[in-house]
From Swiss-Prot:
One of its GO terms (molecular function) is linoleate 9S-lipoxygenase activity. It catalyses: (9Z,12Z)-octadecadienoate + O2 = (9S)-hydroperoxy-(10E,12Z)-octadecadienoate. PROSITE patterns: LIPOXYGENASE_1 (PS00711), LIPOXYGENASE_2 (PS00081), LIPOXYGENASE_3 (PS51393), PLAT (PS50095). Highly expressed in tubers and roots. Detected in flower buds and leaves. This is Linoleate 9S-lipoxygenase 2. Residues 212-246 are annotated as: Disordered. Induction: Up-regulated in roots 2 hours after jasmonate treatment and 24 hours after wounding. Not induced in the leaves. Residues 29-160 form the PLAT domain. GO terms for biological process: fatty acid biosynthetic process; lipid oxidation; oxylipin biosynthetic process. Residues 163-861 form the Lipoxygenase domain. The keyword Cytoplasm applies. Pfam families: Lipoxygenase, PLAT. It comes from Solanum tuberosum. Pathway: Lipid metabolism; oxylipin biosynthesis.
Amino acid sequence: MIGQITSGLFGGPDDSKKLKGTVVMMNKNALDFTDLAGSLTDKAFEFLGQTVSFQLISSVQGDPTNGLQGKHSNPAYLENSLFTLTPLTAGSETAFGVTFDWNEEFGVPGAFIIKNTHINEFFLKSLTLEDVPNHGKVHFVCNSWVYPSFRYKSDRIFFVNQPYLPSKTPELLRKYRENELLTLRGDGTGKREAWDRIYDYDIYNDLGNPDEGKENVRTTLGGSAEYPYPRRGRTGRPPTRTDPKSESRIPLILSLDIYVPRDERFGHLKMSDFLTYALKSIVQFILPELHALFDGTPNEFDSFEDVLRLYEGGIKLPQGPLFKALTAAIPLEMIRELLRTDGEGILRFPTPLVIKDSKTAWRTDEEFAREMLAGVNPVIISRLQEFPPKSKLDPEAYGNQNSTITAEHIEDKLDGLTVDEAMNNNKLFILNHHDVLIPYLRRINTTTTKTYASRTLLFLQDNGSLKPLAIELSLPHPDGDQFGVTSKVYTPSDQGVESSIWQLAKAYVAVNDSGVHQLISHWLNTHAVIEPFVIATNRQLSVLHPIHKLLYPHFRDTMNINAMARQILINAGGVLESTVFQSKFAMEMSAVVYKDWVFPDQALPADLVKRGVAVEDSSSPHGVRLLIEDYPYAVDGLEIWSAIKSWVSDYCSFYYGSDEEILKDNELQAWWKELREVGHGDKKNEPWWPEMERPQELIDSCTTIIWIASALHAAVNFGQYPYAGYLPNRPTVSRRFMPEPGTPEYEELKKNPDKAFLKTITAQLQTLLGVSLIEILSRHTTDEIYLGQRESPEWTKDKEPLAAFDKFGKKLTDIEKQIIQRNGDNILTNRSGPVNAPYTLLFPTSEGGLTGKGIPNSVSI
């Protein structure tokens, strides 16, 4: 469309010395929450005249005065706007004409320099030259903020959408390519400013605030053998006054301003949606708290009906002058979200999927077990390969930590099999949180948390569902760690007080699983481990590099969401510490778990085999055979994994035909070296790192990176509200131990088991805070880009990769159809379970909002 309009306006037979182009951009005001009325169409003309200049750089004609780099064209300036491309309230994009002087010797442009002498920054989306003689259309994908030139130490340069390996870069563009990478790396000094584009590394030394007292001191994560950690983005903030090794923090009110490279910040719609969801959750959070002030038992839910009131009914939106004044003060995008017509009133929480169909089915043993395969944390369960289960903790430090579960506890529930027979038939499985928690449990229980380390044994029934057999709850020995643990084993019951005790035992398991999920499965294994890949890719791979083009969409918004997490979620006293049972030990515990992180094991087939829930099988479609056939996460995940791998293989094979091409790619080798030695530097000496010497190693590594950033994150994130939005199903904290006979708590359990249950799990205030958080995290923003989609259809000029990407998209569409078909198959009982919640977390696409489906390209929330 742009081409037709520009040809009509500017083309003609007499323009042989002129080259016509179209610039698409947005100005700052279009993205300003407080001044949406100042739309681009009103402000566009600020950039006309000579405030913004463009100079093309030839890829074929050198400049003898400039070290034989590509020759620059004369400056060209924006002409009158041609048209507005998008609605005003969406952050308007406007197209401008631009005319360059051109001659035959100049040839094909390979890059351009832009200079902004205006006082404001603007967002440059693209430049398109519609008809370069003897070449046709030349397109530059920009998608970058351009600040006034005095903010930069070097020229802003953008390259054509033609990928080049370093050795195949046109000679006249080579120096520009190298210099741009130097600019993005910076020199490792100084405090970063809002306009900076520098990517650099740092350790997690900014979670605590020692200037505010000892209670706000937190362990530095990364840079030590004791607490290794992936690196984060460097901000360069000064150290704290009391500890020169800790980085100072910015005030909470300025949280949105925490530094990330400018183009890593949330876009207009993403920020608007994010703030809207936060506003809704705050309102929903405050109102029940106000109501609780007039309650006889503040900070306690008195019954399950009390809990359900969070979701049912609620306070309807008021009408009248006050409401009109409120809506007048909120930006238009926020008003649209706040006044949604999908049944989500502003003053109540949406009903979580787990209680939509039935208010009680979540309490069944079948649903408890099913969520280990199809819930929000389906990545922990493993096959039991020795009985009783043995601990891997050092016995010199922790004594005997082996399980006390015996055959007598479980053999009456094995359908006539012995334990050995059940194990040999791959019928026994375990959800094991024991070894992860025991080293910290004594300290955790000095806080308001009172909990156990759990092991749960399960039996695979003939209908494909899992049946809980026994739950072991353990505490550190009261005489010291070296004496091991004290443990008690609980078995299923549906009669009297024993039934209530069994429900509590499952709740303690859910508390364990919730904390491990949030800290390990979610934060550590997706958010934290992917950030070094974001940084290294921008520092070492030019935007011209084909692997940069492959991976870049899978890093969108990750640095920004992680930076905000450090500021308000995972920091000392932050929301995470306030809502998970690990409390102030949470992040330190995740560093200890990172010691066991192995990059190749993050590949889905490798993970399934390592957990024993699959075996290698070359005759199976994905190279592995599942031992639990109806394992929704694994079944859907393997199809997504294979689609990603096929796409990555097609793409990489187009650029690399031999080992030699991998080895001589200096950018690729520098990228991989920096990832190992700096980004994940605490693991630089691990023998499992791929050597990056063969195309297959590149394909496998990129597939794993994309899997982590897209499907793995989707599987462990977007089910949070559907399953944990109803806190009794997945409590995050337990506040007292299992009641013992002869105590008042035990008598209460007999007389009012529901109240005893609610007094044991997460308190009302923590529940509201936690539910508010996961509602935000479980939503898709309206500008989300999903797996198989790209921001620009012209992201590359190479036709074969474009065709391969189209094939990838069609494969994902086929997978969607297969997921729908499987969810409709009544034989597959684990797909929906007793709560009738079809498994859609790995359904590739979604609309915006709280949908429980959709795989965004990146860790973006």
